[in-house]
């Protein structure tokens, strides 16, 4: 009609309108809290019952700069564990190439790209190791929350809201999809369907931090029991490797969670 302005929507704008309309008009997602909790408990029980586990993973750690730009640090690696007290992990992220080995008594942190390693006595279970790595070394293990002994109790203790969001496909595998909310933290998890439920993707959002940075880990090539084989949980220093102390390790560039050109509180 003459006199009326003509509006043109780009594909992205049209999609945004559709998504916004869905968010406003749709009823609460499947919203069966009891079923979501039951299926999550089944997964943690299954994973907790496995004496040997191995998988590969891809992870992204999101950081927010002081000018509120979001950046994602991508890494990939492997995990092999044997309950109750052995684990070997690797993490390669471009700026870092780390290996963590625990034989039930000694924890070794080895920077392959630097050929430097440190060792410390941490006797005890995997649960104890997870706590030590996070609190004393600021080096959390990939998806560690999902593999500790009382995983379900730990991850749901502070939950205030649960959503069953139906299903999704991760890495070509159909999964049940759940979202949980706690104070300052939202987390989502995708769990394979069937008799052997396992985590496929785990996303943690820090809602207590401006712009809500996320940590995402996607698990693949999952193995249990005899499929794992006989992993070696002893550390053998390669030729020329130098041992350093824990305090010195903290000062070495590109052996931590962030690249050397990143600083906490800034960019």
Spans of model-derived segments:
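Bacterial N-terminal signal peptides that target proteins for export
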Residues: 2-15
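Flexible, processing/modification-adjacent segments and terminal tails
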Residues: 31-39, 67, 71, 110-174, ...
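N-terminal mature ectodomain segment of secretory-pathway/periplasmic proteins
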Residues: 34-116, 197
């Amino acid at each position: 009609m003459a006199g009326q302005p003509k509006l043109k929507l780009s594909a992205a704008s049209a999609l945004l309108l559709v998504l916004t309309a869905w968010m406003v008009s749709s009823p609460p997602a499947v919203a069966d809290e009891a079923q979501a909790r039951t299926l999550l408990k089944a997964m943690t029980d299954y994973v907790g019952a496995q004496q040997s586990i191995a998988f590969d993973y891809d992870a992204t750690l999101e950081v927010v700069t002081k000018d509120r730009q979001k950046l994602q640090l991508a890494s990939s690696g492997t995990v092999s564990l044997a309950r109750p007290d052995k684990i070997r992990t690797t993490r390669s992220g471009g700026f870092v190439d780390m290996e963590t080995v625990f034989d039930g008594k000694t924890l070794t942190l080895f920077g392959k790209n630097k050929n430097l390693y440190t060792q410390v006595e941490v006797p005890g279970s995997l649960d104890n190791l997870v706590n030590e790595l996070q609190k004393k070394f600021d080096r959390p293990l990939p998806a560690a929350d999902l593999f500790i002994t009382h995983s379900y109790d730990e991850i749901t203790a502070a939950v205030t809201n649960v959503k069953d969001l139906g299903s999704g496909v991760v890495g070509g595998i159909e999964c049940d999809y759940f979202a949980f909310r706690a104070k300052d933290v939202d987390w989502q998890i995708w769990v394979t369907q069937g008799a052997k439920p396992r985590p496929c993707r785990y996303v943690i959002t820090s809602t207590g931090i401006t712009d809500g940075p996320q940590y995402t880990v996607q698990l693949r090539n999952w193995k249990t029991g005899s499929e794992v084989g006989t992993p070696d949980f002893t550390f053998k220093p390669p030729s020329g490797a130098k041992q350093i102390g824990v305090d010195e390790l903290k000062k070495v560039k590109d052996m931590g969670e962030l690249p050397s050109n990143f600083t906490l509180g800034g960019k």
